[in-house]
């Protein structure tokens, strides 16, 4: 019987200088590491993806839009406070991470962005329930900052507002970008459509939990963070059409994987159906993929749940080999880094 995998099995050494601090000069200007169905590695450029896709393949994009979720301000006592909105629950309500020297209690008012006050209504686990004096999205658009990942060291600027957002983003609610989609520009999307590659959309609002480390060696003990997703009927129909024509379902990003596989889990052994709700799906090696045939993704943090997800698709050893190759060849890692195209191993 094989030894169960532990957190240590998903560690690797990454020189800090390989963590991309800014995007490529142009969308689509990144490198692409291709792990094919025979587990062979190919060094390519992102535009080469067009030649790896076939007519009737279906690209499934996550159309979530990153909101300007970060706010700074003061408590009534004058102490500094930093707020990161995690989820908008009503037009004037949100659950948020609040960082302060002392946690605020119910009834406390937070003066934010020197512009308005939010009231603390209570707490749900690590998140605070806040009431805002106007629609949350309007206030964030006017006063918030783009919430960059913790490994990006500069403060968000106008370039980040534009480039830490996919060109097809339309459903506001994410606090982190679905980064595999950042490589696509409009000409690339038009080229793929012209060659018969289909597209469909899911929505998964990426939460700050995507950056949280796994803190237990026994993976079965890890509690996965929740994210809200929807797989619409139009996407279910597009998947059925693609399969009927022999096309592959190609997830653009791990968030698209989580949405599609969560819908498949809802359907159990029945046909895929439209679905929405919170998902805590934790994909690790041994998981049987039901909805996804190939994956476009960026490179993921050591010991992260996303590294486990890609290892479940391609195999632990092929991913270890791919990451060692990427480090040796000086690929750029994480959100603003290079991409990887993974085809499911041949049976």
Swiss-Prot record:
Gene Ontology CC: cytoplasm
Reaction catalysed by this enzyme: 7-aminomethyl-7-carbaguanosine(34) in tRNA + S-adenosyl-L-methionine = epoxyqueuosine(34) in tRNA + adenine + L-methionine + 2 H(+)
Pathway: tRNA modification; tRNA-queuosine biosynthesis
Coiled coil spans: none
Keyword terms of this UniProt record: Cytoplasm, Queuosine biosynthesis, S-adenosyl-L-methionine, Transferase
EC number: 2.4.99.17
InterPro entries assigned: QueA, QueA_dom1, QueA_dom2, QueA_sf
Entries under Gene3D superfamilies matching the protein: QueA-like
Intracellular or extracellular location(s): Cytoplasm
Known partners and oligomeric status: Monomer.
Role, per record: Transfers and isomerizes the ribose moiety from AdoMet to the 7-aminomethyl group of 7-deazaguanine (preQ1-tRNA) to give epoxyqueuosine (oQ-tRNA).
Record HAMAP family: QueA
Family that this chain belongs to: Belongs to the QueA family.
Name of the protein this chain belongs to: S-adenosylmethionine:tRNA ribosyltransferase-isomerase
The organism of origin for this protein: Bordetella pertussis (strain Tohama I / ATCC BAA-589 / NCTC 13251)
Lineage summary: Bacteria, Pseudomonadati, Pseudomonadota, Betaproteobacteria, Burkholderiales
Gene: queA
């Amino acid at each position: 019987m094989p030894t169960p995998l532990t957190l240590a099995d998903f560690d690797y050494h990454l020189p800090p200088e390989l963590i991309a601090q800014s995007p490529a000069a142009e969308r689509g200007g990144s490198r692409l590491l291709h792990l094919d169905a025979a587990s062979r590695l190919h060094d390519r450029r992102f535009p080469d993806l067009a030649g790896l896709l076939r007519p009737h393949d279906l690209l499934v994009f996550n159309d979530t839009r990153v909101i300007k979720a970060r706010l700074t301000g003061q408590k009534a006592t004058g102490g500094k406070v930093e707020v990161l909105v995690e989820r908008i629950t009503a037009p004037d309500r949100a659950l948020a991470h609040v960082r302060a020297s002392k946690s605020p209690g119910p009834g406390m008012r937070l003066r934010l962005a020197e512009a308005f006050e939010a009231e603390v209504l209570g707490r749900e686990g690590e998140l605070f329930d806040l009431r805002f004096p106007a629609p949350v999205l309007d206030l964030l658009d006017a006063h918030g900052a783009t919430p960059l990942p913790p490994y990006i060291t500069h403060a968000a600027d106008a370039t980040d507002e534009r480039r830490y957002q996919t060109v097809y983003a339309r459903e506001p609610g994410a606090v982190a970008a679905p980064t595999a989609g950042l490589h696509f520009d409009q000409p690339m999307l038009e080229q793929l459509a012209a060659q018969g590659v289909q597209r469909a959309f899911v929505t998964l609002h990426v939460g700050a939990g995507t950056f949280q480390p796994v803190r237990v060696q026994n993976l079965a003990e890890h509690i996965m963070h929740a994210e809200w997703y929807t797989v619409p009927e139009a996407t279910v129909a597009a998947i059925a059409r693609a399969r009927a024509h022999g096309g592959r379902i190609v997830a653009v990003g791990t968030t698209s994987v989580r949405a599609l596989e969560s819908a498949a889990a809802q359907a159990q052994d029945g046909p895929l159906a439209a679905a929405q709700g919170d998902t805590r799906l934790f994909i690790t090696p041994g998981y049987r993929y039901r909805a996804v045939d190939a994956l476009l993704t960026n490179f993921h943090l050591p010991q992260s749940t996303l590294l486990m997800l890609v290892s479940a698709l391609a195999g632990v050893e092929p991913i270890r080999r791919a990451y060692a190759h990427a480090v040796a060849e000086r690929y750029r890692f994480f959100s603003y880094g290079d991409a990887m195209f993974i085809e499911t191993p041949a049976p």
